[in-house]
Amino acid sequence: MRLRARVGVAVCMVLGAVALFKGFDGGLKDKSANAYNNELASNGPYSFFQAYRLNELSFQRFYRTLPQSEIRELVQHEVDEGAQASSAVITKTALAPSANVRPAQVVASGPEKRLNVVLIMVESLSADYLGVFGNKKNLTPKLDKLAEESLLLTNLYAIGTRTVRGLEALSAGLPPLPGQSIVRRPNNGNLFTLGSVLRERGYLTKFIYGGFGYFDNMNAYFAANGYEIIDRSSMPREKVGFANVWGVADEFLLNRTLEELDASHAAGKPVFAHVMTTSNHRPYTFPAGRIDLPSKSGRNGAVKYTDYAIGTFIEQARSKPWFDDTIFIVMADHCASSAGKEKLSIPKYHIPALVYAPKHVKPGRLDRLASQIDFPPTILAMLQMSYPSLFLGHDLTRSDHEEQRAFISNYQEIGYLRIGDDGAKRFVVLSPKKKVNVYRVAEDGETLLMEEGHEDLVREALVYY
């Protein structure tokens, strides 16, 4: 009797588990031709947890689109145009005949430069913290000095409000999609990236992060795309003099970057190091005695400490044998705050970027409107590389490419900022419920004035997104 009772309980548990699994399984949804019925079927625990995990919005369902055949044709045009802006010669060959979009072959106008590239993405560094952009608090003395010796981009905009947005823009060169960043989405490996192009040229590609890279799926994303991962878990305690909940202090992160560059040089390999800082983030703590502001003094102290760390890194790099053969890029991932008088407040996406390579990049200012997604092809153009390109961005160093545009987004709204032939700055905003608005940007750079028409501009935005 006892045995029979146990068997009965076991059977009930198995059946209960099956029923529970079926209750959470989303496989029964989308079986009906009726969209309302499908929504009812999906409105359960499985869909709740699935939506929480993926955090995605269906672009086709919620946003205005163009027919797929038209999109493919127009995207192909943009890929070809992006390549045209990156080289002297374009050969359009069917390098991937099965793909919807054919890569455009970029053929460099000169011999390839096998230079190291160090891309330092600075946490939350809004342009208005820098003295070169008008700040009077002397928060960035080292970056301001470095800007005088660099190519300074004065009109660059972040694509989003989170670190993962900056990471996707600088790796894959893609405009932002509503919902979750590609970094956090499933099936995000083996993409066409800046790293994939450089690895084919024999580069070591490294993602170096001061925090634990499982946060926001960073390690999984970069590993799935062929990067070597170096994060906080890779850094011996004796080499980390200070850390907080977000990561090791920036000076120790950059010390590790120096070690990686030394090792790559010793191995005779060029390296692309994508470095992500953490110190300019709450709780805004950092080692004592570095700057004239105390730890926990808020954002200003954290900005000045990060400035100190980057300046010290550059000074140390100048004594290295690989310095003359290295391009250093300093850029923010996003701004410190996105709140403004508009849902998408354009000034709240304005970020600094400077390119420093005394032997290879002439100092100056680049004032054209630009996006983070323009940097992968720009970096490759500086290296004078020939490659099959799927990038939508443009080489910013070419003055003969007239199109000036940028992309910005929050979770649901995505914007396309464009300077027209008439010199006016207009802004297309795509929102859920297939809503599209076109604005002229007022003289203050933030106020948006509604305008009618401009269907050609709307089509441009729809193609990119």
Predicted regions and their residues:
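N-terminal secretory/membrane-targeting segments
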Residues: 1-115
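Solvent-exposed soluble domains appended to multi-pass membrane proteins
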Residues: 80-465
